[in-house]
């Protein structure tokens, strides 16, 4: 079962790969080219330069800061609980999802992750600040076209168990 495969190449290489996948698995393949959204990430290819820009800016637009009226901002070291705790954890999960295309927020999200179980008012203010940054700085990842011979890199998103007696399903093969 192949659930996701992203690739790039010239038309002939793409057709060869599609043919092989159809022979090995099924001809029920869905191909998306040039501009599409896949697993929440938008992909936009410049058909002149062949560069591909990926981003999650549409997802950022859907996120909302935590209402700071729910906390006492004069007590930044106070632990948050209840609904604020739940909102913090939810927004932190959203920020973690953004790390696929937002390298600019990695250190901040990493810092907030260390306090995921015991967030304080200060962390609520911090996560709101990171969200504001994301909303005001719409960025993503630009993949440049690299001409040359065909190469394939495969990164699996699931565990495999090839043989019935394999006990280590996470073995590198």
Q: Where do the model's predicted regions map?
A:
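Catalytic palm active-site di-aspartate
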Residues: 1-9, 33-44, 60, 94-95, ...
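Intrinsically disordered, low-complexity coil segments
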Residues: 30-33, 46-50, 164
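Divalent metal-binding acidic/histidine catalytic loops
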Residues: 50, 55-173
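Residue-level detector of intrinsically disordered/flexible regions characterized by low predicted structural confidence
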Residues: 20, 30-32, 44, 140
